[in-house]
Amino acid sequence: MKKILLMLLLCTPLLYMGCKAEPEWVNLIAQQEQEKGQEEEQEEADSEFKWANLADSCTTVLINQFMNKPKGTFWATPANESNNSGNIYWQQAHAMDVVIYSYQRIKDKNPSLADTYENYFKLWYDNKANNYDKGDTKYGTTGFGNRFTDDMCWICLTLIRLSEATGDDTYINMAKTVYDTQIITRAWEDEKGKGLPWKELSVDKTRNACTNAPGCLVAAKLYLKFQDAKYLTDAKTLCAYVNANILKSDYRVGEPPLTYTQGTFGEACRQLYHITQEQSYMAIAEQVISYAFTSTRCTNKGFLRDEGTDMNQSIFKAVLIPYVVNLVLDDAASGTVRNTLTLKLQDNAEALRKNMDRTLWPAMYCNYYWGSSFNSANIASMGAQASGASLMEGVARLEAAQAK
């Protein structure tokens, strides 16, 4: 094509002597060559693109902009700009989960960064994950006890993940203590079954999805580690309570359906399937997790919706994503479900990638809704950043699995 263009350009002065303007077809060929070059450059760039690189960027922003590094805990806004981070406890679990997945991904190729991450883990643990109730002995002496039962469940799940990632049982042993002394001791039973209350019994006995789903998962994980039958009994009991009283016929986990409870209950059922080999658990796991991506109650224009901007709502998707990836990577799950969820994750990741403004680095923030860009005139949210970074770490896990 370039040789043809050169010959045509050489002939042009002879054919069009005295004309100041280039013939239209010459300009058209030049334009086509330019567009072709741009397309080739874009194809080359796309072929070199790695989700792991974008995961690095998003997680780095989460750490550098939102972590109180001397304590290993997270602020609600960059450098605590809004001065409103004192009461965020359960959210600390899901921000740290992002760092844990990053740690697992990079530890072999970047030991120095892995050491830095391990130090953050210890600081987070030593500072009791920013627990505002840590000094109240009414909730035990571990420093992780809290008036909210669900908050303790979320924190215990991250303590368990820390042990799974590092091999240090300090964390899961603490989770066991908190569960044994402060979580399961609050469970109460009536004609509806036995379940966990949202808060301490003297304050609020409500048994909801956001407490019983993670409580069930904690019990299942403790059983896998310690092989104590009481944990399996607890997991089955709490799962049965959710099935009987909270799960809807269309697989909404409560009303309104929220991504974090859809994901957590799905993961609890998936774990129970692998413990018991009872197919009914896997069937529920597939349905409730799929609901988060296929129902318009949880999506907006095909992407996971903006569930709210406060610190309780903005971090919901950070809870969901790892459990979706776990299901996709589970060979025991339906191939159709796994393929569908893979495409949904990729679509959401591509949307977030498209809508992140890299020119704003290091303030390259994720929006609450991945189908649009973050407004840099607003104050960024740790919850939104953790959710976006969780998505990127998740698709990076899929990318690594596919490369094997």
Where do the model's predicted regions map?
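Extended ligand-binding groove/face enriched in aromatic
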Residues: 114-222, 232-233
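Oxyanion-binding "anion nests"
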Residues: 261-276, 281-297
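Bacterial N-terminal signal peptides
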Residues: 7-14
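Bacterial Sec-dependent N-terminal signal peptides
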Residues: 15-53
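CBM-like carbohydrate-recognition segments
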Residues: 44-98, 102-150, 207, 280, ...
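Positively charged n-region of N-terminal signal peptides that target proteins for export
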Residues: 1-4, 20
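Active-site cradle of extracellular carbohydrate-active enzymes
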Residues: 206-215, 219-223, 231-272
